[in-house]
Regions:
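Carbohydrate-binding surfaces of carbohydrate-active enzymes
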Residues: 82, 118-147, 155, 300-309, ...
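Exposed aromatic-hydrophobic patches
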Residues: 778-780, 951-956
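N-terminal secretory signal peptides
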Residues: 1-11, 25-26
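C-terminal segment of N-terminal export signals and the immediately downstream linker at the start
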Residues: 31-48
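An acidic-aromatic loop/edge-strand motif
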Residues: 149-152, 165, 171-175, 184-224, ...
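Aromatic-lined ligand-binding clefts that engage carbohydrates, nucleic acids, or primary amines
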Residues: 910-912, 916-938, 965-969
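N-terminal export signals
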Residues: 15-36
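Mature extracytoplasmic enzyme cores
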Residues: 47-58, 64, 76-91, 95, ...
Length: 1010
């Protein structure tokens, strides 16, 4: 069960969460309201006044992507630190997170931990240098709470009160009537190194019940559990005779430090050990170390100038048994009203596997109650406490609140910035879990540790990165922490420099080391600007989602989605987020106009199904059932899937609780806008019957994903032709179909104008062809795999547009129509007559004169800047060569370049006829090109390329006669590393990089519609 209960300071768990959110919501409303109403409130984007400003074209530093910046602890040079901050700033990024990570360094002694460890004077000097230069450059710097991960503190020993703890068990089998005499059974697992003390918590006996046994669990009769702790002699021996019937098991329970150190340590002297994440002592050890040893007056001042967030990585507590804290028995008793010890057999773990089990339903209920108690301790004493401490320093807390069996959705609501990851998250629903917590709490940012791929060091392409992140942005992500940027060098590093995760286990690691060492760094400003514009849109205003999916168990990073919505609803345009019980007690959890959280995500319906984490059992806590009833009575449509006419409590029920739950559900199901169904295929019809439709609609299923943000001025729709997970097969294909977008803002005169926002160029233009129906707008969406389109719906004149009064096109047989200045024009690649129907009712015919045929260049000159290891790990030698190509091939297919990496500049010429005029133009289609590329025509740079659809309009750069086209392509380093470091990279197959084509220049002619 989960009823609000009093905690030590007189606040219930739910009150704790609500209190943390209230201040954030109030601050957001005050900042956003201006002269508008609460329903219209929306924070400005990066301080910009709104869509009329240039915030989209030139995104602010605050919304630009960031780097995870890996240091070899404190073995850094302050001049190099300042130089790397400049490199990050010059490339157009917004900041960095300093993290002590050096998995690639096997011999840790070379890092001189005694003098240059995490937290040492050289480390502090490096942090100060980073903050000082960041303040000058307008960047912000984040700091991990400890070295590597999980959070650990130098000087804490495994036996300390503040150290992480485990509960381990011992066992002995007895036949009926047999006597056990001797030392209490010792733990089945030996203690970790450095653990010198362990305490006997309890000894129990229980009768084996084969009917409850599973493949891994020994079944026990719960009524037979006997506490033998008081019979243990002072010398640790036990004498006990089992009853005559059945087989019996003696179970001993021991508590001790887990002895876990942060990943790939040691990082400090003295060594750091992971802290207790469930007890105030663990948090106090973290904050106390910072206060006493790190936060000098200088550092405090610099944090105010350029500090961003403290960061905690995913909570990967490792133990052979059950993660423990001494207060768990008392906390469990306060939470449930029952003692914990009789239930311990159903809870103990060995190597992450359950050891014993009672009857299945009782076991489920016990485990639910335990992990809910565990979660409350984690969120209260760790997440909230660290967040409040960060605030006291003018910082925020960003964290990945998953890895334990805790309510990560609730954690996301407490955190200033929750974060997920592209490597560890199984699919987009993992991000939607965190997005629900963020949006219900009134926060803005959902961050993502982005771009780590197993075994892909020095072969990761930005194309792959963008395809990964395209879907994540549709699922709620709006900040990217790129994984990552390695400090230049470290002892033992090989060319092209220190890389935190490579080599890894003798082969290429995960996590790219971006920076000047990478050939694509010459083009990375285009990537940074693109990501900044996407972030700017997705951090503007308020996120909207169609449906809230209720989760009885708020885990994340599981890959478990929602019935119907994940597989069927999303391909039809629906959006959803996940909520857990504590979020229903937030100040934002109100209903108005049939919407839940109307000033936030404004969910149109709540969907409830059985608990996926417990065999889809139709469970509801009575407190949650009561809140659902209140929301439904206020007008919120609710759909329940499963046997919720016969609900069960998720935890062990109190006397009469099951009856109260059934009564609440009977009242809920009796309301007119509450529907119960038994087949997940009926979800769509149930929603339609309640009058609920999505904000984005298309007639047939599609791989189109969407995210919706609402500001005072506009509805922003982020559209991506993406996939639900990296492993989805078959691959995503190109799409081309009509999409209807709902406009939720009233405009003067009732006119809704759609604008196309190009995140590659920063241009915002009125869309020329669309249909409108009562404010809803239907546009054509044609996207290649992974490609993105951003549409804004708003009033005439947004983004400086001057065409708002002009009629638009509702139908045409022209391949393209657009507004050019104040004129509506037809663009065609072929001569002929084009018929266009306008919104004014007029039908216009336009004659397109002759258009030159597409041109395929037949010969290319390729100038190569080939890169080799230099005389030092950070030194690169350059060899220049020139080739003439009659056929475009990947470098791996050109003998002279098969193992090359660097920059290739492809140059060709095309001749355009004497009749070429300003009415002509052309698109340059590059075909297959990898990795990054830039185009120059007649010495002038073309607009940035869409990396996932490398076609660029070069019309304004062309002239009659001879034209010189140059394509500069960056080639990743892996092919060179295959031969330079064969012990690490030799097993990697040659990669096909370069300009492969086919390349075409496709002329068009543009004619004004009469």
């Amino acid at each position: 069960m989960r009823e609000p209960v009093e905690q030590g300071d007189g606040m219930s768990r739910r009150a704790v969460l609500a209190a943390g959110a209230t201040a954030g919501i109030a601050a957001g409303i005050v900042a956003a309201l201006g002269s508008g109403t609460a329903a219209e409130a929306a924070p400005p984007v990066a301080g910009a006044p709104g869509p009329a400003a240039d915030w989209f074209a030139a995104p602010a530093r605050s919304v630009r992507p960031r780097f995870r910046w890996w240091w070899p602890d404190g073995l850094v040079n302050t001049d190099e630190i300042a130089r790397e901050v400049d490199q990050i700033a010059d490339a157009g990024f917004g900041g960095a997170e300093i993290a002590a990570v050096h998995h690639s360094v096997k011999d840790k002694s070379v890092l001189d931990t005694a003098h240059h460890g995490w937290g040492s004077r050289p480390w502090r000097d490096g942090v100060e240098a980073a903050l000082r230069r960041a303040a000058r450059r307008g960047l912000t710097i984040d700091l991990t709470l400890g070295p590597s991960w999980p959070v650990a503190v130098p000087g804490v020993t495994p036996d300390d009160e503040a150290a992480a703890k485990e509960l381990v068990h011992g066992r002995a089998a007895l036949n009926g009537g047999a006597t056990f005499q001797g030392p209490v059974p010792p733990p089945v697992h030996a203690p970790a190194a450095g653990v010198t003390r362990q305490r006997l918590l309890a000894v129990q006996a229980a009768r084996v019940e084969p009917a409850y046994s599973t493949r891994k669990e020994t079944g026990l009769d719960p009524s037979s559990v006997r506490d033998l702790t008081s019979t243990v002699a002072e010398d640790g021996t036990l004498t006990w005779t089992a009853p005559d019937t059945g087989e019996w098991t003696l179970i001993s329970y021991w508590t001790r430090g887990s002895g876990q150190q942060p990943e790939s340590g040691p990082h400090s002297a003295p060594a750091a050990y992971v802290v207790d994440h469930l007890d105030p002592a663990g948090t106090a050890a973290v904050t106390g170390f910072w206060e006493r040893h790190l936060l000098t007056p200088t550092l405090r001042s610099l944090l105010k100038a350029a500090g961003g967030a403290f960061f905690e990585d995913s909570v990967e507590l490792e133990t052979d048994g059950l993660t423990w804290t001494p207060s768990l028995p008392d906390a469990f008793a306060k939470h449930t009203g029952r003692p914990l010890l009789p239930y311990l057999p159903a809870l103990v773990l060995s190597d992450s596997n359950q050891v014993f089990a009672f009857e299945a339903q009782l076991t489920r209920q016990i485990r639910h109650d335990f992990w809910e108690t565990f979660s409350e301790l984690f969120n209260r004493h760790h997440v909230r406490a660290l967040r409040d401490w960060a605030h006291s320093l003018g910082m925020t807390l960003r964290a990945q609140p998953y890895g334990l069996q805790t309510d990560a959705i609730e954690s996301a609501a407490i955190l200033d910035i929750p974060e997920g990851e592209s490597l560890g998250f199984k699919n987009l629903d993992d991000f939607r879990c965190l997005a629900g917590g963020r949006d219900m709490a009134g926060h803005t940012v959902l961050s993502c540790e982005a771009g780590a791929y197993n075994g892909s060091a020095y072969s990761t392409t930005w194309d792959r990165f963008l395809r990964t992140m395209g879907g994540a942005y549709a699922a709620g992500v709006n900040q990217t922490v790129v994984h990552g940027f390695s400090y230049a060098t470290a002892p033992g590093a090989s060319w092209p420099g220190f890389a935190a995760f490579s080599p890894y286990n003798g082969g290429p690691g995960y996590g790219e080391s971006w920076g000047p060492r990478q050939p694509s760094w010459q083009h990375v400003g285009d990537i940074a600007a693109y990501l900044g514009r996407v972030h700017g849109v997705l951090q503007s205003g308020t996120a909207r989602a169609d449906v809230a999916v209720f989760r009885q168990t708020g885990y994340a990073a599981t890959g478990i989605g929602a019935s119907w919505f994940t597989a069927t609803g999303v391909p039809l345009g629906w959006t959803h987020q996940f909520l857990s019980g504590p979020l229903l007690d937030l100040p934002n959890a109100t209903v108005s106009g049939g919407r839940l959280a109307p000033n936030g995500p404004a969910y149109k319906a709540l969907f409830v199904e059985g608990d996926f984490f417990y065999s889809s059992t139709p469970t509801l806590a009575t407190a949650d059932a009561r809140r659902l009833l209140t929301l439904a009575e206020a007008g919120l449509p609710i759909v329940l899937l499963g046997a919720f006419d016969q609900p069960l409590t998720p935890g062990v029920p109190d006397d009469g609780e099951s009856d109260r739950l059934r009564e609440l559900l009977a009242r809920l199901l009796g309301l007119p806008h509450v529907t119960r169904i038994t087949d997940k295929a009926a979800v769509g019809d149930a929603l339609a019957g309640l009058g609920v439709t999505p904000d984005v609609r298309h007639a047939t299923a599609s791989t189109l994903l969407n995210a919706h943000r609402v500001t005072r001025d506009a509805d922003f729709y982020y559209l991506c032709n993406g996939k639900h997970a990296e492993t989805v097969k078959p691959p995503v294909a190109a799409i081309d179909h009509q999409v209807t977008l709902r406009h939720t803002r009233r405009t003067r005169g009732g006119t809704t104008i759609p604008y196309l926002l190009d995140p590659w160029t920063g241009e915002a233009t009125r869309i020329a062809r669309y249909t409108e129906d009562d404010g809803d707008v239907t546009v054509r969406v044609a996207l290649r795999p992974g490609q993105v389109m951003i549409v804004a719906l708003g009033r005439p004149g947004l983004f400086g547009d001057r065409n708002g009064a002009e009629p638009h096109v509702v139908d045409t047989d022209a391949s393209e129509v657009l507004f050019d200045g104040r004129s509506l024009t037809v663009r065609s690649t072929e001569a002929g007559t084009r018929t266009t129907r306008l919104s004014s009712g007029r039908t216009v015919t336009t004659t397109v004169p002759s258009v030159p045929a597409p041109i395929t260049p037949s010969r290319w000159q390729l100038d190569v800047d080939d890169r080799y290891p230099g005389s030092a790990p950070t030194r690169t030698d350059h060899v220049h060569r020139t080739l003439t190509l009659d056929t475009l091939l990947p470098w791996s297919g050109i003998p002279e370049l098969a193992d090359s990496a660097g920059i290739g500049r492809y140059r060709t010429t095309v001749d355009l006829p004497p009749g070429w005029t300003s009415a002509h133009g052309a698109h340059l289609e590059l075909g297959q090109v990898s990795d990054t590329a830039r185009v120059t025509v007649n010495g002038t740079g073309a607009p940035p390329l869409d990396r996932l659809h490398p076609v660029v309009d070069v019309g304004p750069l062309l002239r009659r006669g001879r034209n010189v086209i140059e394509v500069e392509v960056a080639i990743p380093l892996v092919n060179r590393l295959r031969v330079a470091q064969p012990a690490v990279f030799g097993a990697v197959a040659r990669q096909d990089f370069g300009l492969v084509g086919p390349v075409r220049l496709v002329p068009y002619r543009q004619v004004t519609v009469g």
